[in-house]
């Protein structure tokens, strides 16, 4: 099990401004595709997506495992401490959309079923990314191809939504072409699932 303390105050303060800029272009794209009134961001860091959503009238919550993320949260009342490796049902499909960006590859394979069960319990629509083999990154311990995640979600009755994934990917690529900073891995790692 890796040490969550690598995600300290320094890590989150260095990423805060970029996270807010990311939210400014990514969240309107999501809203345009999914028209959500409620959202949960799983592995939300300091809650920049939650913050944007709440500023725009969305009932938004965040789940975060690193205490420094919560302590530096933009929405301290709405970001809850949560270990994604421990089975704990918080809400059962209570949200219009569950968002899980840059998290899946950080969950050790022995805990993946708990992680996926948690995601599937939160919403009937899930937008996530997952790093493929070879991407590498801080504390990446479970890089898997998309087919791995698609199979796990299918076992729980969630289908891979090719149309929405393509539309979202095109929107991200358009944002990049328009000058917004987009991590090079981001468009390729996107997946949308629907039950």
Predicted regions and their residues:
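Conserved N-terminal segment of class I S-adenosyl-L-methionine
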Residues: 1-101, 110-122, 133-136, 142-148, ...
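A short His-aromatic
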Residues: 106-107
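Short glycine-centered segments of the SAM/dcSAM-binding site in methyltransferase folds
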Residues: 125-127
């Amino acid at each position: 099990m890796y040490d969550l303390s690598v995600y300290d105050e320094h890590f989150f303060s260095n990423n805060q401004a970029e996270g807010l800029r990311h939210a400014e272009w990514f969240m309107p794209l999501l809203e345009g595709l999914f028209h959500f009134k409620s959202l949960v961001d799983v592995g939300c860091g300091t809650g920049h997506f939650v913050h944007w959503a709440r500023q725009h009238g969305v009932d938004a919550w965040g789940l975060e495992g690193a205490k420094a993320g919560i302590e530096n949260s933009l929405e301290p009342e709405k970001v809850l401490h949560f270990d994604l490796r421990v089975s704990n049902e918080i809400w059962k499909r209570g949200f219009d959309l569950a968002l899980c960006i840059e998290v899946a590859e950080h969950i050790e394979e022995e805990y993946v079923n708990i992680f996926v069960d948690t995601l599937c319990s939160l919403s009937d629509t899930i937008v996530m990314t997952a790093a493929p083999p070879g991407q590498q990154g801080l504390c990446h311990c479970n890089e898997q191809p998309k087919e791995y995640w698609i199979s796990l979600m299918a076992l729980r009755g969630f289908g891979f939504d090719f149309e929405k994934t393509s539309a979202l990917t095109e929107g991200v690529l358009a944002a990049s072409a328009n000058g917004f900073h987009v991590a090079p891995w981001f468009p390729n790692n996107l997946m949308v699932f629907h039950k």
